[in-house]
Amino acid sequence: MPTINQLVRKPRKSKVKKSKSPALNVGYNSRKKVQTNVSSPQKRGVATRVGTMTPKKPNSALRKFARVRLTNLIEVTAYIPGIGHNLQKHSVVLLRGGRVKDLPGVRYHIVRGALDTAGVNDRKQGRSKYGTKRPKG
């Protein structure tokens, strides 16, 4: 246990928190071709590959994912939530943070109902997370 005098001379250092979605913390100046230190809640990108992958051990499924090149020229893997999607190569998508626990290396989610991504059809509950409009009637 340090004395108060020792703490006055050399204070405690706080731990540096590591970001869980680092690609959202980088901007890009296309005029100067240099990366900038600008954080954003979402980022736009272009899908370079759309496919399925299998989850880690106790689970079994075919999870839909897209490889996305962001506007800051970083390429990341993002999960496509919901049942069915209309994404293909060269689709423009909006990305948010949020990992998928049983898919290694997937730290981002694609926002449904934004840009080229359509909302989930015939969804009645939890619609806002899947970009679905309120049903008529």
From Swiss-Prot:
One of its GO terms (molecular function) is rRNA binding. InterPro entries: NA-bd_OB-fold (IPR012340), Ribosomal_uS12 (IPR006032), Ribosomal_uS12_bac (IPR005679). It holds the Pfam family Ribosom_S12_S23. Residues 9-20 have a biased composition (Basic residues). Keywords: Methylation, Ribonucleoprotein, Ribosomal protein, RNA-binding, rRNA-binding, tRNA-binding. GO terms for cellular component: small ribosomal subunit. One of its GO terms (biological process) is translation. Residues 1-57 are annotated as: Disordered. It comes from the Bacteria. The modification 3-methylthioaspartic acid is found at residue 102. HAMAP family: Ribosomal_uS12_B. With S4 and S5 plays an important role in translational accuracy. Belongs to the universal ribosomal protein uS12 family. Part of the 30S ribosomal subunit. Contacts proteins S8 and S17. May interact with IF1 in the 30S initiation complex. This is Small ribosomal subunit protein uS12.
